[in-house]
From Swiss-Prot:
Main location: secreted
Quaternary structure and interacting proteins, as annotated: Monomer in solution; Homodimer and oligomer in the presence of negatively charged lipids forming a pore with a size ranging between 20 and 30 Angstroms.
Protein family (similarity comment): Belongs to the three-finger toxin family. Short-chain subfamily. Type IA cytotoxin sub-subfamily.
Protein's name in the database: Cytotoxin NN-32
Alphabetical UniProt keywords: Cardiotoxin, Cytolysis, Membrane, Secreted, Target cell membrane, Target membrane, Toxin
Membrane keyword on record: yes
Tissues expressing this chain: Expressed by the venom gland.
GO terms for MF: toxin activity
GO annotation, cellular component aspect: extracellular region; membrane; other organism cell membrane
Task of the protein: Shows cytotoxic activity against Ehrlich ascites carcinoma (EAC) model in mice. Also shows effect on apoptotic features such as nuclear fragmentation, caspase activity, pro- and anti-apoptotic protein levels on treated EAC cells. Increased levels of antioxidant enzymes and cytokine levels observed in toxin-treated EAC mice. Cardiotoxic towards guinea pig auricle. Has no cytotoxicity towards macrophages in vivo in EAC bearing mice or in vitro in normal human lymphocytes.
Top-level taxonomic group: Eukaryota
Length: 10
């Protein structure tokens, strides 16, 4: 998926 500013989403 896309990496969020707070937490990396896989």
């Amino acid at each position: 998926l896309k990496c969020n500013k707070l937490v990396p989403l896989f």
